[in-house]
């Protein structure tokens, strides 16, 4: 998943 989530 994207790291900002």
Curated annotation (Swiss-Prot):
Location of Leucine amide modifications: 5
Q: Give a brief account of the tissues where this protein occurs.
A: Expressed by the skin glands.
Q: Quick check: keyword Secreted in the entry?
A: yes
Which key words tag this protein in UniProt? Amidation, Amphibian defense peptide, Secreted
Q: Name one GO cellular component term.
A: extracellular region
Q: Where in the cell is it found?
A: Secreted
Q: Looking at the keywords, is rRNA processing present?
A: no
Q: Which domain of life is it from?
A: Eukaryota
Query: What are the recorded Gene Ontology BP terms?
Result: defense response
- Family affiliation: Belongs to the frog skin active peptide (FSAP) family. Tryptophillin subfamily.
Name of the protein in question: Tryptophyllin-5.1
Species whose genome carries this gene: Pithecopus hypochondrialis (Orange-legged leaf frog)
């Amino acid at each position: 998943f994207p790291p900002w989530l």
